[in-house]
Amino acid sequence: MPFRKTIYKGLIVLSFLSCVISCSVEKNTSLTRNYHNLTAHYNVYFNGYESYKRGIDKAQTTVMMDYHQILPVFLYEDEAVHSAVNSDMKRAIDKATKVITYHSITAKPKVKEGNQSPKDKAFYEQNEFNKWVDDSYMLMGRAYMYQGEFFLAAETFKHILVTFPKEDIRFLGMIWLARAYIM
């Protein structure tokens, strides 16, 4: 029995220390990047995206198509959709905000000595080191669109274009920004 208690206490102390070491976004090490990528994706972003998908499903069931009138191109054009999906989209926005607030790593890592490959140079020139922050901004902008907050959505998509100019998500941001301007 005393041996088991010692093992359990050791595991508790070890898990506590690993959480304390990993939880800081002030340091940019491989361990912190992997920890925050993992927790941001599989905890917060996943739940926000699931809430967003639930809202989309509600929007599709809410809209009644009148085939004698001009049909809407996008679901978020209908005022009834805004109130129907408000709670799900608010939760998606809250989750995306949590990813950005608690898991964003903007601190630069220590630069290795010696010659660097172009891939290494591109890595050190990044402004954001968490892979899910740009996706969270995109999720937030889309959720604003379905809430009918087109100005906030446009501002979010503009932020994506300014903050992530070299990422592939900028193209999706441009498309959704154009959609926000149309509304």
Q: What spans do the regions from the language model cover?
A:
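Acidic, polar-rich low-complexity tracts and alpha-helical solenoid repeat scaffolds
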Residues: P2-F3, S22-M183
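Bacterial N-terminal signal peptides
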Residues: G10-V20
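Bacterial N-terminal signal peptides that target proteins for export
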Residues: P2-I12
